[in-house]
Amino acid sequence: MNRRDFIKSTAAAAACASAGIALPANLNAEENHGWRWDKAVCRFCGTGCGIMVATKNGKIVAVKGDPEAPVNRGLNCIKGYFNAKIMYGDDRITEPLLRVNSKGEFDKHGKFAPVSWKKAFDVMEKEFKKAYKEKGPTGIAVFGSGQYTIQEGYAAAKLVKAGFRSNNIDPNARHCMASAVVGFMQVFGIDEPSGCFDDIELTDTIVTWGANMAEMHPILWSRVNDRKLSAPEKVKVVNLSTFSSRTSSIADIEIIFRPSTDVAIWNYIAREIVYNHPEAIDTEFLKNCEFATGPVDIGYGMRNNPNHPKFSEAEKDTVSHQVSKKLSQAEGVSLAYLGLKAGDTLEMKNAKKAGKHWAISFEEFKKALAPYTLDYVAEIAKGDENESIEQFKEKLQNLANLYIEKNRKIVSFWTMGFNQHTRGTWVNEQSYMVHFLLGKQASPGNGAFSLTGQPSACGTAREVGTFCHRLPADMVVANPKHREITEKIWKLPAGTINPKNGSHFVGLMRDLEDGKVKFAWVQVNNPWHNTANANHWIKAAREMDNFIVVSDCYPGISAKVADLILPSAMIYEKWGAYGNAERRTQHWRQQVLPVGDAMSDTWQILEFAKRFKLKDVWGEQKIDDKLTLPNVLEEAKTMGYDENATLFDILFANDYYKGFKPEKIKFDNSEVNGDTRNVKGSDGEVFKGYGFFIQKALWEEYRKFGLGHGHDLADFDTYHKVRGLKWPVVDGKETSWRFNKKYDPYAKKEETSGDFAFYGNKNKKLDKGDLIGIKGEDKVDINNKAKIFFRPYMDPPEIPSEEYPFWLCTGRVLEHWHSGTMTMRVPELYRAVPEALCYMNPLDAEKLKLSQGDTIWIESRRGKVKVKIDTRGRNIPPVGLVYVPWFDENVFINKVTLDATCPLSSETDYKKCAVKIYKA
């Protein structure tokens, strides 16, 4: 056995041992008699592992890693091995459930009872049309997902944006990747990473920033381990975190920092480069860059009214910081370049213009970095009070030296520790700042790399554009040219698409609370479990005059607060595709029939589209006092559309779609052909299929958006022959390193000095100014250039106090996925980790007179929960910080968390709020 095989086998065994279970029998399963094996993709994280699925007699009987998959090379993590068992939980939802009274009529205060698909859609249609009539396109909403298949997300976005003329659709990826997205768009002018997972094997240094890769991306972490063991003296690993985790186990340096001070640490590294090691600056690379900055008085993404009637008195103190705040000592230093000092009051005048920015000179950039000395940064950033300041300084110096070392390749990985941050976009931008200064970006083994959390947060949420402001292929609804392109591909009358951004995910919850949204449809996520400050949103769902639909496979918290639950097919019960964190798109075929009467989300979307005629939605629509959408029915007639045609007819069953004929293959396709279950559909009749290859039609129409624009995807059939391809796919070849002329065909086309072309900013200009603001009307040409931002350190809106002395951080664990609705149904995973725990430093437990396993209350200004403490577990927080995962609905930690967001990305900061702890 060679070293690589040994690592694979021991990593799998370790994963199982850590979960307290035996090694799955199918780990090394060979093909068994009567089993049909087919390639597929893992249901869980953004790594995008390839798996092999075995079926027999209509049921999945085994799952194993796909040895031909380039991402995982035959290895799966502990969740991956149970991809089959998540589908067969005892309480799987198999039929629509509606709240009804004793007469069987819909009643918001009634109890759930089974109903037919027809009854479900009848009530859903009635409630939607009531909300639409009262509030128009802004009165309805869809909570989408980074776990949508690409086709599901595309169909949902098309129905909502083209059909209902609403932009109130936003995915739960807003909670995990929005800061990374805005960072990409701000810096590169185009979304998604420039590198790929092969950078792990090609680099000399892996630095993790707020990324517990050992548990959240375990297969990638096995590759990091492999790389470290291949050259232990040369290859260095550094883990930066607010607490010690399993990712620290192989780290050469572990840096525990105070929450939010990662911004200051990046500025320290940049200062070291600019002031003390100018010879390390890659001047050739900087010819492709422009320096920039923006306002600091941008708030924290909370409600603008601290006196909102739904706030408790305890909440108002924190929320007041959205309007203004008194600067701390640390901020007095970091914001001195603006003429501010500690004790000054900063008015948040640019809260609605947080993304505004302008070009500055290198000299201004250098000036802004001046305060970030080793002494200043160490003083504010040291997170472990039991570590000496000198030890911490030495670690910071060693970290900076690793980045600066001339011939050392380096990759910076991050996930939610960066993104779920009230300055999440800023800290994303800063990672590129350092890599750009050194010229260590977009080349093999070098790069700042955002790791996606969900399996298709890239492929669906971002690339398809299921965000409230986006269209496919990085286009946005506010851009007239982008709307024109979209209307042409979708064959819509000009002016159909709403030009005003919808509400983002947290904004939609607030709109429900305020009565602005009256109808909401949840698909492939669990927002009432997953959204911070959850007490507010549960009350909004149950006590306000609205109608909530949840499409789900198990009864999570969101299903329990809904008015109507629709049973959804799960991953291998339908055709689909995901796009992972390295831009790799992967497709799979339907392996088995859905359980009961469950149907795919694509089917649900298309069937709902049948309920609306063009005349119901394409007439004049008032959005607000300043915007009314035009009546487009007359132009629709000139295009050959009948106003009595349904949205299904025009958007999904037109001649283009019907041109994709069914293919005779050995795999089921419930949407195309119907199936042997003979499910009675939305019209009360047995659903016999659409008669055309809907999944292929959706894909081929969708890929039109990216062709020729740097987002090129291959055709549908190609993906079923390969183990995924990294886009842009040009002339049948994938792209591993973007913006690098040696590897990227789009970069090769551009005339720039050197080896790089950041074509996302092609033909763009930027206002010119200084550190204070825009000066005059001059603009800087940033054609084919990336931006290097300066961003200052700022405190989060809520920090520990005498009354609430602890930081609270939330996150995931290896064995469970998100809110646990799937993985908590797997007996082996449940036995391994049956409940969420509060990880606490033993010194804090001793001070509070608590012992291992004691039950405590964790209480914030917003709510409280009971939980057992663990002082000996996998995570070891520093004194003054506790960590609680959020997979367990019985430890509903999001009742405690704060719904502050990054003002640029609107992504929630789940990583820091202030709490008090006492024995229950």
Swiss-Prot record:
Its cofactor is [4Fe-4S] cluster; Mo-bis(molybdopterin guanine dinucleotide). Residues 35-91 form the 4Fe-4S Mo/W bis-MGD-type domain. InterPro entries: Asp_de-COase-like_dom_sf, CT_Nitrate-R-NapA-like, MoPterin_dinucl-bd_dom, Mopterin_OxRdtase, Mopterin_OxRdtase_4Fe-4S_dom, MopterinOxRdtase_cofactor_BS, Periplasm_NO3_reductase_lsu, Prok_molybdopt-oxidoreductase. Predicted to be exported by the Tat system. The position of the signal peptide cleavage has not been experimentally proven. PROSITE patterns: 4FE4S_MOW_BIS_MGD, MOLYBDOPTERIN_PROK_1, TAT. The keyword Cell inner membrane does not apply. Its main location: periplasm. It is found in: Periplasm. Component of the periplasmic nitrate reductase NapAB complex composed of NapA and NapB. This is Periplasmic nitrate reductase. It comes from Campylobacter hominis (strain ATCC BAA-381 / DSM 21671 / CCUG 45161 / LMG 19568 / NCTC 13146 / CH001A). The lineage of its organism: Bacteria, Pseudomonadati, Campylobacterota, Epsilonproteobacteria, Campylobacterales.
